[in-house]
């Protein structure tokens, strides 16, 4: 496997992980909103703060994919 193929394989794997992370984030946000609507604002706030970390990592993953594919 040459360097270009290796980079493409890594980019593909990262993209799949990124898509899974995005889907998990969306699901967690939905559940968190449901929890907030039932009175647990604290839990919702904690989940949303944690999801911000996922957002930061999502940016890094997207940048890495872009670099590998350029």
Question: What are the language-model segments listed below?
Answer:
Residues 4-7, 11-36, 44, 48-51, ...:
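Long amphipathic alpha-helical coiled-coil
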């Amino acid at each position: 496997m040459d360097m270009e193929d290796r980079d493409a394989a890594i980019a593909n794997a990262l993209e799949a992980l990124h898509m899974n992370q995005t889907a998990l984030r969306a699901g967690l946000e939905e559940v968190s909103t449901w929890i907030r609507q039932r009175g647990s604002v604290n839990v919702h706030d904690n989940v949303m703060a944690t999801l911000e970390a996922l957002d930061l990592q999502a940016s890094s993953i997207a940048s890495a994919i872009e670099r590998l594919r350029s």
